[in-house]
Amino acid sequence: MKYIVMQDVFFVVLLLVLAVPLGIYMYKVMIGEKVFLSRVLEPVERFGYRLMGVSEVGMSAKRYAVSVLAFSAVGFVFVMAVLMLQGFLPLNPEGMKGLSFSLAFNTAASFVSNTNWQAYSGETALSYFSQSIGLTVQNFVSAATGIAVLFAVIRGFIWKKQKTVGNFWQDLFRVTLYILLPLSLILALLLVSQGVVQSFADYSVVETLENGAKQLIPLGPAASQIAIKQLGTNGGGFFGANSAFPFENPSSFTNLIEMLAILLIPVALVVMFGRAVKDSKQGRAIMTAMMIVFVIGVVAITISEQFAGPSYQGVATSGSMEGKEVRFGVGGSSLFAASTTAASNGAVNAMHDSLTPLGGLVPMFFMQLGEVIFGGVGSGLYGMIGFIILTVFIAGLLVGRTPEYLGKKIEPYDMKMVCLLILVPPLLTLFGTAVAVMMPSVQASVSASGAHGFSEVLYAFTSMGNNNGSAFAGFAADTTFTNMVGAVMMLLARFIPLVAALYLAQNMAGKSSVAASSGTLSTKNGMFIGLLIGVVVLVGALSFLPALALGPIADFFTTFK
């Protein structure tokens, strides 16, 4: 246990050390300031603008939102066409056939919405073309879209009496060119150096040591997709077993690298926020609130997995190892599970269905908090900003003052947008789960009975309703109902809060700043951090406690004899 604690502390310290300079760099990218890559990338940027006919004129929230939706719609149609027609496309050495309409629809919605829910296994269902041209490209642009929208939201708080929130095409291009591509290139090369596969060769047939049997070894351009799947909080694995598969995550060192990649940009964006609003204490307050909840979750999962597993008298135990890779152990698996669900990533290096009841409760609850404990790149922070405004509003009601945040007064219109930001994901999750448990096809998809079977359904629809993408593997997802309903849920959960965030940004940008007074609520001290954590947890608890009581909590009590 001492080793696990040291590992977790080292991880958090290293994460913060890497995130601070990256956050400063991303702030310069956001405001268009020159960075050390400008000499190389500026000509590419200018050429790209000319090629696409991009105007750098600012956009209103409506135009920005329409641009996001139109761009995502084109990506959706393209990915769906590639998946259904992959049997006729190149880079298909194994002769993979096109996906069914419902599965292609679900997969396209999943990757366009940055969810990466997978109702298929990559090595048996998709060609190299589909993986690299279809899905990997969406991993880049869906992540860039989230960060671009965050840029617009931040501008809403730092601009005064403006009618625009920035230019989507410029934001999208700069995020992709200056942030995601360089980081992904570095990470992909590092992963390849550690044994992660990157090849367009045919699958290999090898003779095993046991009776000379033949075995097919899947290959493919995995490292390039894994790099952006982690950095962009996408999470969709090149192979079905995701980051538990040795070709994706071969060692404890690559496990550390991938966990850092999952949280690096979300944490750096908080640093960037503090720089952008000219008050680093604001960023530190948000970081502290997120980190406290994250650390509590890591501790809860680790203790549950280390001590709640089966024990045998006279036999030393290394914790509950069911569904875990020996090379990662309880510590590496627990930290990964917390990171991937706190950050809206969804990649897994262990089977979450095999976690102990309380160990599985924490990842589920992280998602049910709205993916704001670091959250997805961009979307996590603008979701947390929604909770901050709600917290300020509640505090204002308690003392009878007009609530303010960063010098901007909070008005009824702002609260309507905040309600859309916060309430849409839990409403979709609960409605989807309620309908699903009544469907015979979903009941047949569940491998377990009782409380754990309900947990599998609740986890699946929580994951889709909060754009995470991970799953309890005992849930067979490839049914027409789950594919179609899940796709609609993922799209609504992604784009309704996104559009609400943009309209919130424009309303804020149009206001003038008010000077802070002695009665202004401080949003950067310990009291506010505690209040913010309380609001985030309370909203999650009020929304999901009845469902959790029927699922993982009831499952926990069945372990007592």
From Swiss-Prot:
GO terms for cellular component: plasma membrane. NCBIfam families: kdpA (TIGR00680). One of its GO terms (biological process) is potassium ion transmembrane transport. The keyword rRNA processing does not apply. Part of the high-affinity ATP-driven potassium transport (or Kdp) system, which catalyzes the hydrolysis of ATP coupled with the electrogenic transport of potassium into the cytoplasm. This subunit binds the extracellular potassium ions and delivers the ions to the membrane domain of KdpB through an intramembrane tunnel. GO terms for molecular function: P-type potassium transmembrane transporter activity; potassium ion binding. PANTHER family: POTASSIUM-TRANSPORTING ATPASE A CHAIN, POTASSIUM-TRANSPORTING ATPASE POTASSIUM-BINDING SUBUNIT. It is found in: Cell membrane. The chain crosses the membrane at residues 4-24, 65-85, 133-153, 177-197, 253-273, 285-305, 380-400, 417-437, 484-504, 528-548. This is Potassium-transporting ATPase potassium-binding subunit. Keywords: Cell membrane, Ion transport, Membrane, Potassium, Potassium transport, Transmembrane, Transmembrane helix, Transport. Its main location: membrane. The system is composed of three essential subunits: KdpA, KdpB and KdpC. It comes from Listeria monocytogenes serovar 1/2a (strain ATCC BAA-679 / EGD-e). It is a multi-pass membrane protein. Belongs to the KdpA family.
